[in-house]
Design a protein with these regions (language model features):
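Conserved catalytic core of the tyrosine transesterase superfamily
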Residues: 1-294
Length: 294
């Protein structure tokens, strides 16, 4: 007869799984067994069908369990019945064709506009090379929404100061042109003036490391982390947070989702749509201004 203990012994002796992993499987399978026995006193593992498992998942969701928890427990049940099928305890696998609930992606973290205003205030920064370079990096991320790898790959020739455009080489070497404003233009010119005084100034690389060549991802991440900590309490303080901040600001000030997709260099619109949650503040303001009972 099929039992949880036989499966757990298989995990220990044949798959060499850790005791903690074995206990996690035991806990998940016991939860299903308890549910099934409440439905039928004559419950056996061999009598389980797909509908019973599907109803169990719905029961867990109704009880407030997260999709990640439901999917983990379903995964345990799937492995249990794969074992049972191979060992001929059952003739068919009732969990095989079942899919768990979709897991929601974590919402992007971003800085508020007043936090960015404070961070970019020129009085917050020194006038030496490292400070000017750091501020330029922050503004580049915030005004263009580019990725870390794209920023590191920039050359001086990628910047068109007359048209105020920057050529960005993204994933798959796909290039896109992104406009920028006077604040970034002035920051870049100030940075390039100081850069020209350095030994490696003839390099075509836009953002020079201290010893020449391109900056490393670690260097840029540290610069961003250190400076975001000055104005915000977000748990994550990374270049990608500034990319999220760019996207949020664009949407809140009226940019269309298709235009934002092109600026961010996304291949699919669905990737960009994760940012639409950030316009809630704008929708709330519209509601307050327009609804007669607001």
């Amino acid at each position: 007869m099929l039992s949880i203990d036989k499966f757990l012994e298989y995990l220990r002796s044949e798959l060499n799984r850790s005791q903690r992993t074995v206990e996690n499987y035991r806990e998940d399978l016991k939860l299903f067994e308890q549910y099934a026995r409440n439905l039928s006193e004559s419950f056996t593992w061999e009598s389980v069908d797909s509908d019973m498992i599907r109803n169990w998942m719905e029961h867990m969701i109704d009880a407030g369990n997260k999709a990640t928890s439901v999917n983990r427990r379903l995964s345990a049940l799937k492995m249990f019945y794969r074992f049972a099928l191979v060992r001929h305890y059952v003739e068919s696998d009732p969990a095989h064709s079942l899919k768990g609930p979709k897991e929601s992606k974590p919402l992007p973290q971003f800085l508020k506009e007043n936090e960015m205003d404070e961070l970019l205030d020129r009085k917050m920064w020194g006038g030496d090379y490292n400070n000017v370079r750091a501020r330029t990096i922050i503004i580049l991320f915030y005004e263009t929404g580019m990725r870390l790898s794209e920023l590191i790959g920039l050359d001086v020739d990628d910047v068109n100061f007359i048209k105020k455009e920057i050529k960005i080489t993204g994933k798959g070497n796909k290039q896109r042109i992104v406009p920028f404003g006077d604040e970034l233009k002035n920051a870049l010119l100030e940075y390039l003036t100081l850069r020209a005084q350095r030994v490696m100034a003839k390099s075509g690389v836009l953002l020079l490391a201290d010893r020449g060549g391109r900056m490393s991802p670690v260097q840029v991440r540290e610069i961003v982390k250190e400076n975001l900590a000055r104005v915000c309490s977000l748990k994550k303080k990374s270049p990608h947070v500034l990319r999220h901040t760019f996207a949020t600001a664009m949407l809140n000030h009226g940019a269309g989702i298709e235009s934002l997709k092109r600026l961010l260099g996304h291949a699919k619109l669905s990737t960009t749509e994760i940012y639409t949650h950030t316009t809630f503040e704008q929708l709330k303001r519209v509601y307050i201004e327009a609804h007669p009972r607001a």
